[in-house]
């Protein structure tokens, strides 16, 4: 059965399906939207008591519901200076060292940091001998993405690609998954060197957004696009630890890359399959 599911993903017109779903998710369809939201809540066991607006009827579109805001104070940010926090609610897929420029995906599967970053060799070189962490956001999760540490935006890259599912089954069976799917790479300058936040698209992910550029995809293209940003002066964008940096409209995965010697060790309990909650300790930074 697993092989059938993977084969269907190769055959499915993934971009077309995702865009059709995206149009529905953005539509103000009244009672149809509300009925679908109620079904989705029940189907995935979503805890609406955490949402700022717990009544499904408060959301005009499915996208509004999916990117729902949490109640204030529900995800307190660990403010210790030597602590990096979880950027999202989700589950750790994999984490560890970047070895020979390669990142571990699942048993028998690796991919290169160079490919993940859209072939940007200068960017990939900055993460040699560093560390990575991959976090999967399930449909039930809160889908806003936050900063693990304070950083100043220096570059954004849009990388075209496939739209395979990014669930654990697919990660185990599709080689180079996260370097094959459409994605948005944001690079920040931090006190511990560069930080890459890679927002990976997936089947029926209607869009990827950032707080500085709005919707980055769609529309999609066939070329890699890059944007450079000033890191000093009045136009520089610095985001504090815990600040929102982006969001998915339907679930996906975040891959983070850290510079060599940025991380001393991952926090207790942070390992593959561990549940993550935004704002809680993720790693201890090097002194």
Swiss-Prot record:
TM helices/strands, residue ranges: none
Cofactor details (free text): Binds 1 pyruvoyl group covalently per subunit.
Cellular component GO terms held in the UniProt record: plasma membrane
GO molecular function: phosphatidylserine decarboxylase activity
Keywords for this protein: Cell membrane, Decarboxylase, Lipid biosynthesis, Lipid metabolism, Lyase, Membrane, Phospholipid biosynthesis, Phospholipid metabolism, Pyruvate, Zymogen
Membrane association type: Peripheral membrane protein
NCBIfam families: PS_decarb
Protein name in UniProt: Phosphatidylserine decarboxylase proenzyme
Organism, scientific name: Shewanella amazonensis (strain ATCC BAA-1098 / SB2B)
Gene this protein is translated from: psd
């Amino acid at each position: 059965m697993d092989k059938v599911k993977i084969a269907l993903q190769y055959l499915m017109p993934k971009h077309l399906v995702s865009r059709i779903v995206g149009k529905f998710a953005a539509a103000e369809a009244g009672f149809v939207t509300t009925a679908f939201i109620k079904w989705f809540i029940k189907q995935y066991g979503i805890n609406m008591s955490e949402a700022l607006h717990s009544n499904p009827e408060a959301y005009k579109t499915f996208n509004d519901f999916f990117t729902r805001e949490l109640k204030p104070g529900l995800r307190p940010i660990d403010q210790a200076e030597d602590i990096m926090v979880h950027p999202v609610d989700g589950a750790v897929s994999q984490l560890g060292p970047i070895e020979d420029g390669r990142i571990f995906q699942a048993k028998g599967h690796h991919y290169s940091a160079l490919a993940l970053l859209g072939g940007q060799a200068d960017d990939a070189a900055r993460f040699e001998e560093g560390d990575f962490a991959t976090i999967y956001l399930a449909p039930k999760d809160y889908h806003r993405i936050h900063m693990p540490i304070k950083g100043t935006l220096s570059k954004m890259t849009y990388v075209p690609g496939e739209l395979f599912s990014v669930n654990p089954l697919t990660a185990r069976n599709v080689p180079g998954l996260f370097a094959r799917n459409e994605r948005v790479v944001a690079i920040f300058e931090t006190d511990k060197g560069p930080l890459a936040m890679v927002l990976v698209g997936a089947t029926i992910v209607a869009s990827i957004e950032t707080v500085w550029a709005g919707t980055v995809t769609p529309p999609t293209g066939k070329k890699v696009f890059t944007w450079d940003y000033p890191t000093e002066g009045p136009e520089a964008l610095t985001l504090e630890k815990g600040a929102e940096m982006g969001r998915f409209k339907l679930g996906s995965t975040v891959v983070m890359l850290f510079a060599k010697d940025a991380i001393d060790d991952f926090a207790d309990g942070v390992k593959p399959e561990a549940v993550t909650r935004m704002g809680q300790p993720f790693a201890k930074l090097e002194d």
